[in-house]
Amino acid sequence: MKLTCVLIVAVLILTACQVIAADEADANRLSTRWCACGVNYYCCNEVCTWREDPCP
């Protein structure tokens, strides 16, 4: 029973780490697009948009 609990906890921790890593990859991709668009622009649907305009 103890071993089963340890295995379940280990799987949950690994899953959480994978989700966090995926989120960080998305954040890095967004920041790269931000830099490619310029300081006052953001990437919206792969189009550079002025930072104060809504996403088209």
From Swiss-Prot:
The keyword Iron does not apply. The keyword Transmembrane helix does not apply. Disulfide bonds join 35-44, 37-48, 43-55. InterPro entries: Conotoxin (IPR004214). Its main location: secreted. It is found in: Secreted. Pfam families: Conotoxin. Keywords: Disulfide bond, Knottin, Neurotoxin, Secreted, Signal, Toxin. One of its GO terms (molecular function) is ion channel inhibitor activity. Expressed by the venom duct. GO terms for cellular component: extracellular region. Residues 1-22 form the signal peptide. The cysteine framework is VI/VII (C-C-CC-C-C). The presence of a 'disulfide through disulfide knot' structurally defines this protein as a knottin. Probable neurotoxin. Belongs to the conotoxin O1 superfamily. This is Conotoxin Cal6.22.
